[in-house]
């Protein structure tokens, strides 16, 4: 921050400087995209559907230029300046002509949004900038593009980088319609067979913490080290991390203290989000992610780490085939377009979605790991950033732990979100990494 300037305890509001004629019309509204429709039916004060992306800079944030950067971006992302509303049949997003606010960071991470709030927030503390988004608005890839635009605009405002043609959503650009399209509906193929149903899976046996339950724990890992380790197995970083996760779960399941109840399910399955923008030519800033679900089946016996690596690799290769992804998109969008479901009142529809999420959703997998990949800002901006951090949304009471990964320059940050009294999964996960020669450092805060 600038010398002598402090963040106020309340939200910091700034005077709009943009031309009133450039403002988005108040009648601008959006249907929830296909992936977002489940969240209003299942979210709560604890299960918030909110995730966090942070950039830790090498110098303290200068609040004056930062607020100016926020002001410059006021009209650039109208599809994020939304509030959730109930219709008779569906929830929808309604544009609100309110200024974005900057708040001091320091409270609980990934907390829920109040009814009067926008569905994203900007937070600052020292040299750290964070944005938190509801999954109703966007996935991690969309939120990262917002954070990138915010940081690039801030650095240009500070004269720390020279304005260039680096690809980011610039303040002076008019938002393109494809930025807020429902890409699932755009790329769906009709009348495809549905994917096969999968059986229920193993879940962690740990007790829940008292409310507020959610806490995050992050670790710093040298990118070069972990990439080299993954390459020794002949796989990508994502495949390697999923294998580590499954191996850690297998170790936990072998503990003599585990009850028979928790060992009834011997299938260990991890949900891995896939950014569909890499498969389809979409520029949407909303949700466009599906999951693949590599697994091991302990009914067949114990797995060596090398066997898990091989199993995960082939699962990922098969399930990320575009034809199989098309089947999942077709199933999801077809359900949304079902005439009976479309004509069902919202309160009944929400009960159906909540039941489906609980019975056919979370019971089918043992964990989630989201890898946002290795990020870069370019244009001289990278040298001003130390590392990035991605904290996943709070898990439900069945799943209990989530994991998020993001890389930047020479540093990878691995974050666990946990609602239990135990840190055993984190310990086993890190133990597998260190056994493989990867150095891991705990990040304070």
Language-model segment annotations:
Residues 181-235:
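Flexible, P/S/T/G-rich "lid" or insertion loops adjacent to the active sites of thioester-utilizing
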Residues 2-179, 227-231, 238-258, 363, ...:
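Non-catalytic N-terminal regions of enzymes
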Residues 196-202, 323-329, 445:
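Short coil/turn segments at secondary-structure boundaries
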Residues 255-271:
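Short, positively charged interaction helices/loops
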Residues 214-216, 287-375, 380:
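Helical lid/core segments from catalytic subdomains that handle acyl or acyl-like groups
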Residues 45-57, 87-104, 116-118, 207-218, ...:
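Acyl/amide activation-and-transfer machinery of modular secondary-metabolite enzymes
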């Amino acid at each position: 921050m600038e010398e002598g300037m402090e963040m106020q305890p309340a939200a910091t509001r700034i005077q709009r400087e943009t031309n009133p004629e450039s403002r988005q019309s108040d009648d601008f509204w959006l249907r929830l995209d296909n992936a977002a429709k489940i969240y209003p039916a299942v979210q709560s004060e604890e299960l918030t559907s909110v995730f966090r992306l942070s950039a830790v800079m090498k110098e303290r944030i200068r609040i004056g230029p930062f607020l100016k950067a926020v002001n410059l971006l006021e009209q650039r992302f109208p599809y994020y300046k939304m509030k959730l509303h109930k219709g008779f049949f569906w929830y929808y997003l309604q544009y609100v002509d309110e200024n974005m606010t900057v708040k001091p960071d320091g409270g609980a991470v990934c907390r829920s949004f109040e009814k009067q709030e926008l569905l994203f927030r900007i937070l600052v503390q020292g040299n750290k900038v964070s944005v938190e988004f509801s999954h109703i608005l966007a996935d991690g890839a969309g939120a990262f593009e917002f954070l990138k635009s915010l940081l690039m605009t801030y650095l240009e405002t500070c004269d720390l980088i020279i304005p260039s043609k680096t690809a980011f959503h610039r303040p002076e650009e008019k938002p393109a319609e494809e930025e807020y399209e429902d890409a699932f509906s755009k790329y769906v193929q009709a009348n495809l067979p549905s994917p096969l149903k999968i059986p229920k899976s193993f879940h962690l046996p740990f007790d829940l913490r008292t409310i507020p339950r959610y806490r995050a724990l992050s670790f710093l890992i040298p990118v070069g080290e972990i990439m080299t380790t993954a390459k020794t197995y002949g796989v990508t970083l994502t495949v390697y991390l999923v294998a580590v996760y499954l191996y850690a779960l297998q170790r936990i399941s072998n503990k003599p203290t585990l009850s028979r109840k928790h060992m009834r399910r011997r299938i260990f399955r991890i949900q891995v989000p896939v950014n569909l923008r890499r498969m389809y030519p979409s520029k949407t800033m909303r949700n466009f992610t599906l999951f693949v679900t590599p697994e091991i089946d302990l009914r067949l016996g114990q797995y060596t780490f090398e066997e898990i690596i091989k199993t995960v690799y082939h699962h990922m290769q098969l399930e990320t085939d575009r034809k199989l992804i098309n089947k999942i998109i077709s199933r999801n969008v077809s359900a949304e377009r079902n005439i009976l479901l479309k004509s069902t009142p919202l309160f009944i529809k929400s009960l159906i979605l909540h039941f489906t999420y609980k019975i056919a959703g979370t019971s089918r997998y043992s964990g989630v790991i989201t890898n946002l990949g290795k990020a870069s800002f370019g244009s001289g901006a990278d040298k001003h950033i130390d590392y990035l951090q991605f904290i996943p949304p709070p898990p439900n009471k069945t799943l209990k732990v989530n994991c998020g990964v993001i890389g930047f320059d020479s540093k990878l940050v691995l974050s666990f979100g946990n609602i239990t009294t135990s840190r055993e999964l984190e310990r086993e996960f890190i133990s597998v990494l260190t056994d493989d020669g990867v150095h891991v450092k705990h990040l304070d805060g």
